[in-house]
Amino acid sequence: LLTTHENPDGDGLGAECGLYYHLAEQNKEVRIINYSPLPPAYHYLNEDGIFEYYDSKSHDKWIKDIDLVIVFDVGDFLRIRTLVDVIKKYQIKTMNIDHHPHPEQSSFNYNIVDLSAAATGSMVYDYLKVARKSAISKNSLLGIYTAVMTDTGCFRYSNTDNKCHEIAIECLNNGIETHKVYQHIYENSTRSRI
């Protein structure tokens, strides 16, 4: 199970997407289940219907049999809300992957925290570069680009480093239409917002 914090942002969602496609390609049984629904700005990541909104009736039966929950981009375990209760109920091991400091790391069985990483998505990228024998898939790269672009303020913040640009170059070289990612997130509005 892959999940991220309530009211998810581009980094959490992009990291989930990046790792999801890798694991699916390895024939692992994997699902993305989040406490909050997918925000409309990120629907372009969901063309394959990979993002699910947690519902105890439809998910708990599957969750009780899994071996690991990977939690992305959460400074606090409780930010995955009711999923915490399910994880504790079934005593499922948890792995935290994040680039923020964690005062309460003991909530997780495993912690992978890199305070120097610009985004959790860049940590997923680093993992995929080592774990894969073949190139990173375009679907994974789309998620990773989303994570890095949003958490660096479109490459404007001080956390933007060489690796961020290397990731962007790899994404461009593999057909990610970076301008469309920007448009989906920042140039579309709901009717109610207009």
Per-region residue spans from a language model:
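Anionic-ligand anchoring segments at beta-strand to alpha-helix junctions in alpha/beta enzyme folds, i.e.
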Residues: 1-65
